[in-house]
Every structure is written in C-alpha cells, then in structure tokens.
Amino acid sequence: MKLDFLDFEQPIAELEAKIDELRHLDGQDMDLIKEVSALEQKSKNLTQSIFNRLSDVQVAQVARHPQRPYMLDYLKEMFTDFKEMHGDRAFADDAAIVGGLARINGQAVMVIGQEKGRDTKEKIRRNFGMPRPEGYRKALRLMKTAETFGLPVLTFIDTPGAYPGINAEERGQSEAIARNLIEMSELKVPVICTVIGEGGSGGALAIGVGDVTMMMQYSTYSVISPEGCASILWKDAANAADAASALGITAPRLKELGLVDEIVEEPLGGAHRNPSAAASSLKDAILRQLELLKNKPVDELLETRYQRYMQYGNFDVA
C-alpha cells in the first residue's frame, strides 16, 4: 500500500520516493543496494527526529490519518470468533457503532467501537464515525448483555464526536450519552476503554467510562477539536495549533494529568505504517489489563472505578 504523507512529513516523502526509484533499477548492483540501505536508514532517522518533536496539532493530524487502522482493522488483527450484534431494539441499527461477542486469546469478551469507514460508500454508511442516539443505545444494550453473562467489555474510541444533526437531537442524543455514562460507571464487569484515533468530546465519553483508559501513542482525546476551539475563541480555525496546545489533547499530557492510565506505543511513524505491529502492542496491553482486573471482586471493582472518577479535577491550592 502506498503511504499518504502529511504536510510535515514531506522530507520523509521525498526520501521514500528516491528509495522507490532506486529499487526499480538493477537490484543486483552492490553499490545500488548499499545506497538504498543508507537511504532507508536516513529515512528512519529522519522519521524518528520528526516524530520526536511533533506539536499537538500535528499529533491530531496523525490521529486522523486516512490510512490509520480503524476499529474493524484492530478487530480482525486481535480477535477471533467475532459475532456482530445489531440494533438498539428501539429504533435502528447505527453502523457508526460496531459491537459483538468475540474472543481474545481464547477469552470471551464483548467488543464495542466506533468505525469511520474507508471508502466513500462506507464513510456515508457509518456516518464518518459519528454515532446517533441509536448507536449509543446499541452499545449500552451490548454492555448490559456482557454484564448478564459476566463478560469483560472492551471499547475502542475513534470519533470526531457524536452526530449533531437535528434528527439525532430529536431522538435524544444527549440523553443517550448521559445514560451510557451512568450505566457504564455501574457495570459489574471489567471495562477497558482505548482511544485508537480521535476521542471527540461526549461522543467518545459515551463508550469511554471504565476501569482502565488507554490511548494509542498518537491518538487524541478532547472536549472539542482544535479547529472548533479556535473558531470559537479566535474566530478563526487557522489558530488550531494554539488551541491544540491549550486543550492538552495528547496522550502524554493526559497521562500526566491522571486522566489516562496507559499509553500504547505505536510503530515508528504512526500505527498506519505497520497496523499489525500496532495491533500486537494494543493486544498485549489489553491482555495485561484484563489479567489485573478479571479476579477483582465486583464490590472492589465498582468502588475503585468510582474513586477513579471522583479524583478527576482534584487539585491542591498552595
């Protein structure tokens, strides 16, 4: 697959183009092989250098990369025996939320996540990963099913936000989100939430309340997009970089604030460079967290979860 490079990756793109050009020449020339090897190392070093100093708004660009692995990609790489479950039993089946029963290393779990879609047809069908109320109600139905059978719940967050259309508001978008926050806080099974791309506001939180919150290294989590924030505060989306810095949207910043428990390392250059490696890292992290949670008594699980969220926003006054 040909990689799409972001604007700040253009020096890398030029090196990769040169490498591809040389690869199409006589592959038996030893000098040529050495030159390609040297350029590959140079590209790797340059990628490392650029990604070591990404600004917050550049991290947001990586989180939205069109080739970044989505929920269904992780599902195929990490799980077996997936059986999708459809509908909220009240209105419709929202394709922006995918969920169902699956196994991870043989252990039965309930998997739920937001899916953006790859091509135009899929993006439209999945509403670009922006769930409607019926999507969140479907997610809650699946969580309650998991609770009934004592299955851990694994959620994968990747949305610019809940769908803000009039029809969604008419069907109770805010109520659906609020209901999920309440119900997830009281689920009597382990809940592990992972931000794999964009974690956009209440649309992300509606499947983001759990015992453990993890973020992929180049994912983001925020109450509003940098562009949206800039449009409100500066009346100009061009100030997105300033907004991103002020919002503190990146995994390291959120872990520093105690809002995230673990950062899952991505391959050099981002998860889209090597989706299988990214999935392997995430799978290891989930299995590790499941091992820590699976034998906790229900009362202890709920109390720890409650205290975890009660600590949010605490600060000391000097």
UniProtKB/Swiss-Prot annotation:
Which chemical reaction does it catalyze?
N(6)-carboxybiotinyl-L-lysyl-[protein] + acetyl-CoA = N(6)-biotinyl-L-lysyl-[protein] + malonyl-CoA
Q: Where in the cell is it found?
A: Cytoplasm
Q: Which family does it belong to?
A: Belongs to the AccA family.
Q: What is its EC number?
A: 2.1.3.15
**Tell me, what does this protein do in biology?**
Component of the acetyl coenzyme A carboxylase (ACC) complex. First, biotin carboxylase catalyzes the carboxylation of biotin on its carrier protein (BCCP) and then the CO(2) group is transferred by the carboxyltransferase to acetyl-CoA to form malonyl-CoA.
Q: Name one GO biological process term.
A: fatty acid biosynthetic process
What UniProt keywords are attached to this protein's entry?
ATP-binding, Cytoplasm, Fatty acid biosynthesis, Fatty acid metabolism, Lipid biosynthesis, Lipid metabolism, Nucleotide-binding, Transferase
A Pfam family reported for this protein in Swiss-Prot or TrEMBL:
ACCA
Question: What does the entry list under GO cellular component?
Answer: acetyl-CoA carboxylase complex
Q: How does it assemble?
A: Acetyl-CoA carboxylase is a heterohexamer composed of biotin carboxyl carrier protein (AccB), biotin carboxylase (AccC) and two subunits each of ACCase subunit alpha (AccA) and ACCase subunit beta (AccD).
User: Chief location of this protein?
Assistant: cytoplasm
A GO molecular-function annotation: carboxyl- or carbamoyltransferase activity
Q: Which gene encodes it?
A: accA
* InterPro entries from the UniProt entry: Acetyl_CoA_COase_a_su, ClpP/crotonase-like_dom_sf, COA_CT_C
* CoA carboxyltransferase C-terminal domain segment(s): 31-292
Native source organism of the sequence: Hydrogenovibrio crunogenus (strain DSM 25203 / XCL-2) (Thiomicrospira crunogena)
Its pathway is: Lipid metabolism; malonyl-CoA biosynthesis; malonyl-CoA from acetyl-CoA: step 1/1
- Its name, as the record gives it, is Acetyl-coenzyme A carboxylase carboxyl transferase subunit alpha
Q: What class of enzyme is it?
A: transferase
Q: Which HAMAP family match?
A: AcetylCoA_CT_alpha (MF_00823)
